[in-house]
């Protein structure tokens, strides 16, 4: 699966490919040398994997291929969340010092393999729909995973998820945004936020996978309150 965007950076669509890559090679040293913000953004994307797959399963929804989330996908998605809780903060600390470690190795596996299997086979829900909706704003300079982290905060608030406080604390400790202010959108107008809600609802499959149903008006309120 590939994600396509318009020239202006706004979300276009998911492109379903005929086959997966034959091989994925990830050099730990390359990841360790990359800007830390990129890896942290990857954590934000991975963090949503479990909660979106869980929502998709509860809503009897479908993944981007049109199938129901399988057991393996849900196991991988849960392992993704558990790995972040166990290793994410330590991995960021090590990467900030420019060194690799077992925690970094596990984080790379989580961000790339577990999250990839979990989201593609498990399905997406509100967190990604919001992240895609935010791309209509030229002033939103957040990386994809950062926008997903914000979307996840909104999703978990909507669902009244018991993990809400744990997820917010994790995001604060690693530096992932969970509020409009942290996204650099603290001054966003009501009209622009309504446009984000409109764009969010255009992600019809993702919205159908959200177990806690929401209106556009409620979504605007939740984004303001996040």
Whereabouts are the PLM-identified features?
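A glycine/threonine-rich phosphate-anchoring loop and its flanking beta-alpha core
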Residues: 1-72
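A short secondary-structure junction motif
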Residues: 50, 54-58, 87, 91, ...
């Amino acid at each position: 699966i590939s994600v396509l965007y318009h020239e202006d950076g706004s979300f276009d669509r998911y492109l379903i490919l005929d086959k997966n890559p034959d091989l994925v090679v990830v050099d730990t040293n390359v990841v360790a040398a990359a800007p830390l913000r990129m890896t942290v953004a990857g954590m934000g994307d991975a963090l949503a994997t479990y909660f979106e797959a869980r929502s998709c399963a509860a809503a009897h929804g479908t993944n981007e291929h049109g199938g129901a989330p399988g057991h393996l996908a849900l196991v991988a998605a849960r392992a993704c969340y558990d790995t972040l809780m166990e290793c994410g903060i330590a991995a960021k600390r090590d990467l900030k010092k420019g060194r690799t470690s077992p925690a970094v190795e596990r984080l790379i596996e989580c961000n790339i393999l577990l999250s990839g299997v979990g989201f593609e086979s498990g399905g997406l829900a509100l967190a990604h729909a919001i992240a895609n909706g935010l791309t209509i704003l030229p002033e939103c300079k957040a990386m994809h995973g950062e926008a997903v982290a914000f979307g996840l905060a909104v999703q978990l608030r909507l669902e009244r998820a018991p993990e809400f406080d744990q997820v917010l604390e994790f995001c604060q400790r690693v530096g992932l945004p969970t509020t409009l202010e942290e996204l650099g959108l603290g001054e966003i107008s009501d009209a622009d936020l309504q446009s984000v809600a409109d764009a969010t609802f255009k992600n019809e499959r993702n919205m159908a996978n959200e177990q806690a149903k929401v209106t556009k008006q409620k979504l605007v309120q939740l984004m303001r309150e996040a």
